[in-house]
Structures are given as structure tokens and as C-alpha cells.
């Protein structure tokens, strides 16, 4: 079977485009389903042939877009291990983490079913899982906020410094105390495997959210 490297056909860029589009939809939907923001700021749209809820709040949308704009060059270079949406309580302690573990193969097998043919269908299944995840999660306390964390491979440090200069959107090293949860409950939501991408989504949930 013929194989391509990540550089051929701008493979890394194609995967990064697909992932960033998906992550944008996923973040909006998580914020809606977990009621981080009032339902009134969301509008129903259609993505991946399923209904989703997308924010129409300009500042929130800009933050999400800026974040993913800076993540994209790291995805292109396969420097991202995890993208994590962290929901924080009023004391800025994490109550939930939606963890997207991302693995991209160094070589791409070429076949009639490879590249992007099945990826949209697989991503649709993730969106559907997020839509109903509140059935397996406890209610969050009122007044929650969120942040996005990116776990990178060690080699990504220099790339991130360059991106900060170019994008004018500073990355801040996360304080472990700010993002650590003691003995969280782990809830697997979805796993996908394709020729160009492997991804797993799970939630880490704090045991006692009201304390």
C-alpha cells in the first residue's frame, strides 16, 4: 500500500482545518449543554448535518476563534496531545474537564476510503454525544466560567513562542493547582479511529461540585 508523509498534499494543514472547525463547534455546544452561559445567547445551526447550538455573543466567539487560530499551527505540526475545555466554579476551581485526546499518524495510507471521506461522519457522532452528555453528568454550580487548555509535546515550546509573536494572543503556562482535580470521576464519551486521525473524548468530573 502506498503511503504519504505528513508533508505530502499539505496533510497537516488539512487535518488542522478539519480539527479546528470541529473543535469550534464542540466548544460552543459544551458551553450550551453545560449551561455555562444563558441559553439566550445561542442560536440553532446545522453542522455535520445535525442541529447544534452556536453562541452569537461577539466577545465569546472571538475568544474561541482566537484560541483555535493559535492552536491550528500546532496541530499542523502534530504538536498537540490534548485540547481541554475546563469549566470552573466561582472560586476558579475546575468542576469538569472535557478532554479531546488527539493522535495523528506520521504516515497516511492511501486507499479509496482514506483522507476525509469518513471523518465528517465520525465527528458527527462526537457532536451527538456532547449533545446528550448532561444525562451522565451532575449539575454544575451557578456562576461557572470556562477556559481552554492545550497540552503540547515538549518540542512545541518554540513553536508556541513564535505563534505568540505572530498572532498577538499570549499563551500562559497553566498552574497545576488551578487545573487539578482530586480523584475525579472519568466518563468516556466517544472514540474515533480513521486513517488520518484518532481522537478520544472523555470528561473528568469533580466528585463534589458544590464544595
UniProtKB/Swiss-Prot annotation:
- Record InterPro entries: HORMA_dom, HORMA_dom_sf, Mad2-like
Tell me the leader sequence span: none
Q: Quick check: keyword Transferase in the entry?
A: no
| Principal location listed in the UniProt entry | nucleus
Residue stretches making up the HORMA domain = 13-203
| GO biological process assignments | cell division; DNA damage response, signal transduction resulting in transcription; double-strand break repair; negative regulation of protein catabolic process; negative regulation of ubiquitin protein ligase activity; positive regulation of DNA-templated transcription; positive regulation of peptidyl-serine phosphorylation; regulation of cell growth
Name of the featured protein? Mitotic spindle assembly checkpoint protein MAD2B
- The scientific name of the source species is Bos taurus
Coding gene?
MAD2L2
Amino acid at each position: 500500500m502506498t503511503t504519504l508523509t505528513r508533508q505530502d498534499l499539505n496533510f497537516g494543514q488539512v487535518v488542522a482545518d478539519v480539527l479546528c472547525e470541529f473543535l469550534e463547534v464542540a466548544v460552543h455546544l459544551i458551553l450550551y449543554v453545560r449551561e455555562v452561559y444563558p441559553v439566550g445567547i445561542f442560536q440553532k445551526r446545522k453542522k455535520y448535518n445535525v442541529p447544534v447550538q452556536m453562541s452569537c455573543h461577539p466577545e465569546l466567539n472571538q475568544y474561541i476563534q482566537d484560541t483555535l487560530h493559535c492552536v491550528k499551527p500546532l496541530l499542523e505540526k502534530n504538536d498537540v496531545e490534548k485540547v481541554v475545555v475546563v469549566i470552573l466554579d466561582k472560586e476558579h476551581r475546575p468542576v469538569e474537564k472535557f478532554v479531546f485526546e488527539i493522535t495523528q499518524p506520521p504516515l497516511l495510507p492511501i486507499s479509496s476510503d482514506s483522507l476525509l471521506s469518513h471523518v465528517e461522519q465520525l465527528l458527527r457522532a462526537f457532536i451527538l454525544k456532547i449533545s446528550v452528555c448532561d444525562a451522565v453528568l451532575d449539575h454544575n454550580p451557578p456562576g461557572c466560567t470556562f477556559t481552554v487548555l492545550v497540552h503540547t509535546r515538549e518540542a512545541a515550546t518554540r513553536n508556541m513562542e513564535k505563534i505568540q509573536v505572530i498572532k498577538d494572543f499570549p499563551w500562559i503556562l497553566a498552574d497545576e493547582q488551578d487545573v487539578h482535580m482530586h480523584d475525579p470521576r472519568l466518563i468516556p464519551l466517544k472514540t474515533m479511529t480513521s486513517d488520518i486521525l484518532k481522537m478520544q473524548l472523555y470528561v473528568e468530573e469533580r466528585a463534589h461540585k458544590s464544595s
